[in-house]
């Protein structure tokens, strides 16, 4: 679909201006997770996937309806939300802490609830500035709702990566152009 093409273009443009060894998750015309400068492609894919997951979790009703104190500023809200959804809710929801941020003590956003919510995410685009050397990158990307991938290709294991994409019903395009800065 046109939206996938747009999102892949956004991801690839983002990667062109990012430190080498990078991947970018994109959806709705915006980059939602970038993993850059790591020592391996899978580390980039995990890092960017984690950021994309956080972006999606911020859209959950449980997060959108947090009962913040009206005096709490935007930067503090952002930090509290990050702690709340990234398994550090004791820092913001524990007795003695929640009163600094909320009108009432929020219910925890459990790992099970988060996994269930994220399992419904679909249609995410993923760009890579170089080939995926192993299918583990595809496995990790699938967990974050990736459906469309653009990468240069050229790995001796391209067949295994393509097979993994096929197994998950993903569309992958080879750009035949690396976006490395070196």
Where are these predicted regions, by residue range?
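Short, conserved, surface-exposed binding loops centered on an aromatic residue
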Residues: 14-17, 25, 115-118
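Short beta-strand scaffold segments in enzyme catalytic cores
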Residues: 21-29
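Short, basic/aromatic recognition patches
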Residues: 1-21
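Feature captures the catalytic cores and cofactor-binding loops of soluble hydro-lyases/lyases
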Residues: 39-182
């Amino acid at each position: 679909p046109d939206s996938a093409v747009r999102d892949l273009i956004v991801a690839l443009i983002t990667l062109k201006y990012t430190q080498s060894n990078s991947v970018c998750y994109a959806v709705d015309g915006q980059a939602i997770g970038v993993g850059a400068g790591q020592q391996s492609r899978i580390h980039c894919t995990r890092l960017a996937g984690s950021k994309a997951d956080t972006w999606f979790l911020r859209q959950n009703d449980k997060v959108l309806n947090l009962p913040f104190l009206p005096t709490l500023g935007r930067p503090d809200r952002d930090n509290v939300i990050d702690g709340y959804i990234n398994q550090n809710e004791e820092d913001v929801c524990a007795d003695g802490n929640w009163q600094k941020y909320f009108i009432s003590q929020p219910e925890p956003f459990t790992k099970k609830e988060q996994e269930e919510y994220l399992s419904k995410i679909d249609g995410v685009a993923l760009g890579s500035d170089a080939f995926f050397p192993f299918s583990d990158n595809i496995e990790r990307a699938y967990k974050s709702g990736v459906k469309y991938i653009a990468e240069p290709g050229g790995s001796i294991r391209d067949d295994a990566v393509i097979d993994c994409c096929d197994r998950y019903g993903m569309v992958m395009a080879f750009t035949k152009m690396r976006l490395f800065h070196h």
